[in-house]
Amino acid sequence: MEKFSNIAQLKDSGLKVTGPRLKILDLFEKHAEEHLSAEDVYRILLEEGVEIGVATIYRVLTQFEQAGILQRHHFETGKAVYELDKGDHHDHIVCVKCGEVTEFHNPEIEALQDKIAEENGYRIVDHALYMYGVCSDCQAKGKR
């Protein structure tokens, strides 16, 4: 996404345009397929020669989550990771050995969840599905 789009996205979300917010949003655009922790954001920015304090990073990540720019997940590692909210629903499979995260969408799983909710008198408004296993790379390395 271009800087102009990022500025518009921040303004549309009701957030003031600041240097740290632009840098962090740009970083998530560059790493759109990854799930990044606050520590990852800090490290990547430092590698790029950008110095933003860890407290500021946490604050911006929270603001972005509240504004619907980022989604927060808590995988097995215990620390929060964030990804751009692309507007599409997907679920996650997480490797318990190396932490690799694979995103997927399965219409059959979605339909089954809706059916279970309906059978129990619910209407699903949101959900998150995390599956944990051992990825093929770790299986090949014998990390069962």
Swiss-Prot record:
Entry's family note: Belongs to the Fur family.
Protein name per UniProt: Ferric uptake regulation protein
Subcellular location, record wording: Cytoplasm
GO biological process, one term: negative regulation of DNA-templated transcription
Top-rank lineage group of the source organism: Bacteria
GO cellular component, as recorded: cytosol
Region called Dimerization, residue ranges: 87-144
Primary role: Acts as a global negative controlling element, employing Fe(2+) as a cofactor to bind the operator of the repressed genes. Regulates the expression of the fbp protein.
InterPro entries, sorted: FUR, Fur_C, WH-like_DNA-bd_sf, WH_DNA-bd_sf
Assembly notes: Homodimer.
Chain sites annotated for binding Fe cation: 89, 91, 110, 127
GO molecular function: DNA-binding transcription factor activity; transcription cis-regulatory region binding; zinc ion binding
Annotated region (DNA-binding), positions in chain: 1-86
Keyword terms: Cytoplasm, DNA-binding, Iron, Metal-binding, Repressor, Transcription, Transcription regulation, Zinc
Major place of residence: cytoplasm
Binding of Zn(2+), residues: 35, 83, 92, 95, 98, 103
